[in-house]
């Protein structure tokens, strides 16, 4: 991980020979013990005041970084591999999926209250390719946690919302381009929706943050909803702006409940 740039892989995976260099049976509990220890410490400090959400990147997004080596505007090497060697792509995605299930399982055992699978680069694929190379593996992971609070977030995958709605999960995350009511009509009243404020809203004046957050809350009314951004908080955002957003939500709750 490079600060303010994101994941970096010095060795990419673009051939069968490179795939053989991966450890086939990594000890997830040992190698990522610092994550699980951090969860336990955080849970203790929180003392059940608020729920703690576990997190993992979805297989397609992890695949993009492993093939490309770093962030990209196009992820052309990753997308190219889907055409030139789909078998290799599926083999790598299967491995990522199995390790992700184990990683999230250990988070669950360490005490998280819910899990979220985050597919940041879902939107760079067309509908059919995302179904084959993305959602197939999202479904496998979600199925492994049936009965446990689980959120699926596929950024930019508007065309795939009908398929995402069919995957068993507690909640579906929305980016800021996804229509709330259309999504609600697809998933029904029992599924929780999460989102979907534009992350750039946090650069705005306080009054605008308050206005847009209240507008979002009004649009959900009494529906099942978790207020959130439509993606992550950008690195240079002033933390005070996040506090304004949170306070607005709390004030709204007091006013209408």
Question: Model-found features: residue ranges?
Answer:
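Divalent-metal (Mg2+/Mn2+/Ca2+)-assisted nucleotide/phosphate chemistry catalytic cores
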Residues: 1
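A gly/proline- and charged-residue-enriched helix-loop-helix capping module
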Residues: 4-44
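Active-site loop segments of alpha/beta catalytic cores
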Residues: 31-257
């Amino acid at each position: 991980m490079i600060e303010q740039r994101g994941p970096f892989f010095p060795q990419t995976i673009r051939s069968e020979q490179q795939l053989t260099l991966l450890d086939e049976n990594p000890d997830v509990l040992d190698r990522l013990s610092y994550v699980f220890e951090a969860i336990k410490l955080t849970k203790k400090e929180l003392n059940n005041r608020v729920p703690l959400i576990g997190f993992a990147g979805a297989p397609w997004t992890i695949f993009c970084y492993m093939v490309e080596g770093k962030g990209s505007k196009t992820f052309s090497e990753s997308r190219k591999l889907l055409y030139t060697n789909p078998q290799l792509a599926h083999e790598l995605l299967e491995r990522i999926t199995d390790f992700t299930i184990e990683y999230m399982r250990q988070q669950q055992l360490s005490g998280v209250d819910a899990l979220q699978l985050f597919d940041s680069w879902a939107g760079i694929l067309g509908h059919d390719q995302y179904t084959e190379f993305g959602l197939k593996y999202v479904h496998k992971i979600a199925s492994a946690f049936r009965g446990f609070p689980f959120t699926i977030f596929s950024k930019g995958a508007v065309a795939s919302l009908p398929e995402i709605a069919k995957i068993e999960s507690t909640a579906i995350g929305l980016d800021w381009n996804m229509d709330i009511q259309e999504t609600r009509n697809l998933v029904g009243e029992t599924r929780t929706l999460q989102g979907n404020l534009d992350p750039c809203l946090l650069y705005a004046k306080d009054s605008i943050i308050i206005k847009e957050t209240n507008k979002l809350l009004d649009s959900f009314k009494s529906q099942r909803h978790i207020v959130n951004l439509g993606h992550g908080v950008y690195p240079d955002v002033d933390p005070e702006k996040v506090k304004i957003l949170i306070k607005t939500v709390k004030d709204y709750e007091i006013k209408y409940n």
